Amino acid sequence: MKCEIAVSQSKTELQEFIAVLQKVNVKSYLEIGCKFGGSLWHIGKSLPQGARIVGVDLPGVEHGAKDAQPHLEECVLAVKAKGYDAQLIIGNSHDGDVIEKVYSLGPFDACFIDGGHTEADITQDFNNYSVCTTKLVGIHDISYLRFPEDKKRSNIEVPRVWQQIKKGFRHFEIRHEKKDCGIGVVWV
């Protein structure tokens, strides 16, 4: 698998998010939920040479892919080979050891949350990682419309949680798809 094509987000929404990161001169970036590593690779290579890029993922969990870890590791190595300080933390983003490792590598200019999609997951990731972020936090899947017949994706609660999170912050939304994806951004 090539890092260039392994993206779970809308490509145009991701490009717009990258443009925002570049505009505010992000030099350190944290991604929670990397799956195959495509977004980490695309975002990482768009930042200034030498930027610190950290990914946190737990391959094989719900909405993840059991075979994702080798691809994710390959993408992190590809970013590192381009002259970036890229690191991967394999583990649950809610575990104390993982949080401690992330904090030891921070602070970060920007964080992108695309891990667990339940209310508890999103809230916990936002609360844990917005505090070590100095500029902005992006949250993926704010436009996802739940389809009752799609049982395996029925617990995606991002749109509802996004409505609560954005109330306390200056924010904007990147929405190019009508029923899927979407990136919400809050300034911290």
Predicted regions located by residue number:
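S-adenosylmethionine/decaboxylated-SAM
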Residues: 2-188
